[in-house]
Amino acid sequence: MEKNDLKLMSQQLPELRDRQIEAALSLLEEGNTIPFIARYRKEATGSLDEVQLQGIQEQWHRVKNLRDRQQTVIKAIEEQGKLTPALRMQIEAATELNVVEDLYLPYKKKRRTKAQIAREQGLKPLANWIFMAKENDLDGKAAEFISQDVPDVQTALEGANEILAETISESSTIRAWLRNYTKQHGELIATVKKGGQELDSEGVYQQYYDFSAPLSAMNSYRVLAINRGEKAKILSVKILADEQIVQNYLNFRLVKKSSAQNAAEFVKNAAAEAYKRFLGPAIERELRRELTEQANEQAIKVFGENLYHLLMQAPIKGKVVLGFDPAYRTGCKLAVLDPNGKLLKVAVIYPHKPAPENQRQQAEGQLLQLIEDYQVEMIAIGNGTASRESERFVAQTIKKIKRPVYYVIVNESGASVYSASQDARDEFPELTVEKRSAISIGRRLQDPLAELVKISPEAIGVGQYQHDLPKTALKVELDAVVERAVNRVGVNLNTASYQLLAHIAGLNATLAKNIVRYRNENGRFTSRMQLKSVPRLGPKAFQQAVGFLRIVDGDEPLDNTDIHPESYAIARQLLQAAGIASELGSPMAAQQLRQLDIKQFVSEKVGLATLKDIIASLCEPGRDLRDSLPAPLLRQDVLTIEDLKPGMQLQGTVRNVVDFGAFVDVGIKHDGLVHVSHLTRKFIKDPRQVVAVGDIVDVWVLSVDLKRQRVQLTMVQPNE
């Protein structure tokens, strides 16, 4: 890596040491995956995690894009014969793309402007003379340039003005100052357009009808909301800077002390025109684009963090679950699943209008029969259409059962997408889309990660303004989040679907399908080493993937840990030193392992960080990180918004976290909002400092708007 590139990356990643950045890039260049590096190359990187490694990768791409653009610009100017050593040095020293573009602007091929025409008419010497003029007789000088193309003095002066205005607008120094000044002191103004109020019938953008805020204080969600309002032709948006301060700067920068008064006024007017026609609009476009890019990055980050917490929700293990896909006219689809997610029974009941009364009366008995026949312990109700009516029906029904039966409201976003997919058709070819959806809802409760990876992450609605975000950047981030979650948890090699396996480090959909096919043809895997026999799974893929694949009850006990086979030798040494033969995972074995002085086992190949990981894995073979996370909130009774009163204490599940707060499901039809100012008594900017998707939280009702069906909540206990 070039020294300048490393310096640039260090500036963007100040919390990391140069050695860490270089080591991470070297490992990535060798074809190692981020999960593999984070887990198994801690000594090399100084224990960088997946998020830090992804940040290094992203910054490296930015640096490469900058260097590529610098070379393209240098080549283009060189081909024009206008590249000087000083200009080359300026371009190569630039650390931002907009600086490179500013330097390139005077040499950039552009459409034939008025200034270009004036140059072709031979008026550039006149513009240069006026800029430096110590004489007041501009008309006299302009008369010298009258020709067939320039019929009079006024035409000559207008041409000189065009040349000066364009030249001023292309000054990299002026553009840099104006950009920084506007960024620091400019304001974003939004107003309602004529007729916009009629278009905004529900008042979604009402708070932006007469809105202004400093650019430096614009929140990402406001930027995206204003952009959406502008796109809908409801809002008019502009960026304003103090024109007098801008003009004073331009005058100071451009007008020579020795200039004659008439020449000075001419240059001032040209500068004012340059700002009005060229500089102002260009910088406004640039800053609007920058604001949008930053807002998009933040929104994508929010989406990614919410998705991660959704994927990492604790699974419900060892329970028979009934998936309940609510509907009105077409009936509610039910799917009974055994503790491993295997389908036992599907049914359709009609508990809601417009179904005939006899069908509605039969629905309760049908549900009770399924619960008793299959000893259902939990019911997963999708949160879509007819969800709250179905919740009420389920709550009333389970009261008639003597043993405990609970229900959970499950986010069904994307369930219909998966149910209509080829994968779902292949698994359940005889079932309708709706019945497959009930299966998906039930499995989401049993193992959220295994089920949610089957659909596109974009279909899971846990973001803000996600449909306005750049699709490619969103996909890259969300794919990385899914990969991080799947590899942190690990998967059972003998039960995992190909969709889950495809997210394991080093694997893809093709290799994952090959693994499943090999498993179906040859029986269950009894050793990780058998992976080497899977078609097209080469040494590199094996190295990257094997540590994240678990085998329960296999030939090698270490295969049910996240210890990499490359470390089996040292793992066995540790077991031997602790005097452990076969009782791996027992409390006694864990105690003996934790008492070891592992520093004596440090070598060139195995460092302290890896040894600590190995000890943790040996103490808890087969561990699932998600088991320590809060379980879903189980309910037996139902609430309505009419039941809520200010001051009432409730328990709820965080469904979504956005920049301005968190949406909490407290058991009514619509999620309540905890504004960021009500998350904690302390001042915080980012709600994710306090809450995450899936958290179980205590809240108090602040206000209830029955007309708009909105509930304001607080996590700060009243009168505390």
Q: Where are the regions that the model predicts?
A:
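Generic start-of-chain signal for non-secretory N-termini
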Residues: 1-22, 29
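Short, ordered loop/turn segments at secondary-structure junctions
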Residues: 40-42, 242, 326, 339-340, ...
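Duplex nucleic acid-engaging cores and interfaces of nucleic-acid transaction enzymes
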Residues: 52-55, 62-323, 327-430, 438
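Long, highly charged, low-complexity intrinsically disordered interaction regions
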Residues: 64-82, 92, 426-524, 543-570, ...
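Structured, non-catalytic alpha/beta "coupling" segments that mediate domain-domain communication
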Residues: 76, 90, 103-104, 229-242, ...
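A glycine-rich phosphate-binding loop feature that marks nucleotide/adenosyl-phosphate handling sites
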Residues: 180-187, 324-328, 384-386, 410-417, ...
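Single-stranded RNA-binding regions, centering on S1/OB-family and related RNA-binding modules
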Residues: 551-555, 559-720
